[in-house]
Amino acid sequence: MTVEMKVERGLFDEVMVPCYNPMEMIPVKGQGSRIWDQNGNEYIDFAGGIAVSCLGHCHPVMVNALTEQAGKLWHLSNVMTNEPALRLAKKLTEVSFAERVFFANSGAEANEAALKLARRYAADVYGPEKSEIIAFKQGFHGRTFFTVTVGGQAAYSDGFGPKPGDVTHLPYNDIEALQAHISDRTCAVMMEPLQGEGGIIPPTAEFIQAVRELCDKHNALLVFDEVQTGNGRTGEFYAYQGLGVTPDILSTAKSLGGGFPIGAMLTTAKLAEHLKVGTHGSTYGGNPLACAVAEAVVTEVSKPETLQGVKEREQWFREGLAKLNEKYQIFAEIRGKGLLLGAALNEQWQGRARDVLVAAGKEGLLVLVAGANVVRFTPSLVITKQEIEEGFAKLDKAIASLV
């Protein structure tokens, strides 16, 4: 007979590695864009698990896909393939430029695979001297030692000893800096097509075109980290599809599984040939459970009405933020695209994004931050208008408590 353990927030401090600082409440149930904690308190979710819960909590298509697959087959390893993985890979090639897919378990793993492929391709075709990776300041690409080094935030990568070498960080949206530095030694340029953790910073059209042209000029691969922007988040299935450029390699995760862990690296057949048998791998990557859920997510999110709905919801959010700003004069600007939005605080409110987050939580609203000065919103792509209106009423009360 199993005795149910009493779980309280204090248990976290007793048993967990202290690299997180979670809220005091513990959620126990979610439905749509609402969650409930142990005490029955209800919250509106504008955070979406950091841009993960693209269909909200416990969406029927995801629940059905998972439960159906759970009764069939869970795990094999890549000694064998499986039907959900092959179906999902086919779908991803149909909704993107890609011809080949590598499955992993997270965005960091997908980015690690992308970086290894870029280095491998350059070494095979041009020789070992072509190894430089250019990335951008304030970028974020994951927490493995390689990806956190490529990410342009020293706060995440310092303190762990010698870092992987031949990585250069340049200012985002600075064409002249890239022109001055990129060379035939550069094997790849890695970037987010809209910086997330760095403050919700969109690229200029001129910058994104220049990056592609300079990569072509110097035979460098263009790697798009679409872990946060992908799977419908910007109103396109992948953000690159609205930018007029196509990358050589793309990483995707977060919303791909809608809450079930999965990541993928997408690329061309020509490049994929350089990851031969044994050069890279993953025990869990492409497991049937994750791929069955992700297949259901991709099918749902890629529907034209879902993508159009993202654009409509973006306007609802912008209108709500504009009304709050008229009332409280708190935001300097609203940045982002689709349902990856950042409300940048003005000079009087500098450094208080977390204050807004905490106050919102007390009112029953979950939001995020992107640095000290940006309140970030990454809700479900199918959040209802009623849920949005309720959320903004709570945000109004939260800001009022801080004024």
Curated annotation (Swiss-Prot):
Signal peptide: none annotated. PROSITE patterns: AA_TRANSFER_CLASS_3 (PS00600). The keyword Amino-acid biosynthesis applies. Pathway: Amino-acid biosynthesis; L-arginine biosynthesis; N(2)-acetyl-L-ornithine from L-glutamate: step 4/4. One of its GO terms (cellular component) is cytoplasm. Pyridoxal 5'-phosphate binds at residues 107-108, 140, 225-228, 283. It catalyses: N(2)-acetyl-L-ornithine + 2-oxoglutarate = N-acetyl-L-glutamate 5-semialdehyde + L-glutamate. Its EC number is 2.6.1.11. May also have succinyldiaminopimelate aminotransferase activity, thus carrying out the corresponding step in lysine biosynthesis. Its cofactor is pyridoxal 5'-phosphate. It holds the Pfam family Aminotran_3. The modification N6-(pyridoxal phosphate)lysine is found at residue 254. N(2)-acetyl-L-ornithine binds at residues 143, 282. One of its GO terms (molecular function) is pyridoxal phosphate binding. This is Acetylornithine aminotransferase. GO terms for biological process: L-arginine biosynthetic process.
